[in-house]
Amino acid sequence: MRLISINVSLPRAVSVHGKEIETGIFKIPVSGPVVVNKLNLQGDGQADLSVHGGPDKAVYLYPWENILHWKKVLQRDDLGPGSFGENLTVEGLAEKEVPIGDEFAIGTARFVVTQPRLPCFKLALALETPSITKTFLESGRTGFYLRVLHEGTLQARDPVYPLPSREPEKVTVAEFVELYRCKRATRDQIRRILSLAALPRSWKEWLTSNGRLQAEETGD
């Protein structure tokens, strides 16, 4: 596992259907050591802090293998590091293999996986593909957000070192996304999700309120 690219950008104004909005989704690869702060990377920023950024979404990671997938599916040779608005393009961290709560070190910084990325219209804007938000979520290739446990510095080509997880249960990012999509889960799945210390409280409340995540009668 290794860091392929570090991508940052500050918010800028763009026109969408005649309306001006600010977005930080247009990430650009940068070279040299980059400082990791509690809320973002040096040189990076988020526009709408009500849905982006904050400690639980400080850094967005996207697997390089996913970019190769979309290059083929969308027939887009122009896609590369940063195309999906990610801060870190990493090789070897697939959603099906990475549980929420996993911890790892890159450079001198340390991170924990908190939640998947749910796409919004800004992804469609960045890729100039209106249908991508639905396809992106259905694919399960969402990437995931990181909380910064220890600030530090990192740079492209740094290895990614897995660290012992402090979670007693394992729920992969892919499993979580599928439960979110289908809105049904076994009682055991619900129990495991609610036990995750790394998963933000807002997610737990959303998933279990108003019957959004219903328990299947399976005898669990």
Annotate each PLM feature.
Residues 1-125, 131, 166-220:
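Electropositive, beta-rich accessory/interaction domains or terminal extensions
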Residues 32, 142-144, 156-158:
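A short pocket-lining beta-strand/turn micro-motif at the edge of beta-sheets
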Residues 90-91, 97, 143-150:
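Short alpha-helix capping/helix-loop boundary micro-motifs
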Residues 101, 151, 155-158:
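Loop/turn positions that initiate beta-strands
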Residues 130-147:
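A mid-sequence, solvent-exposed acidic-amphipathic segment
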Residues 160-164:
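Short hydrophobic beta/alpha edge segments that flank linear recognition/processing sites
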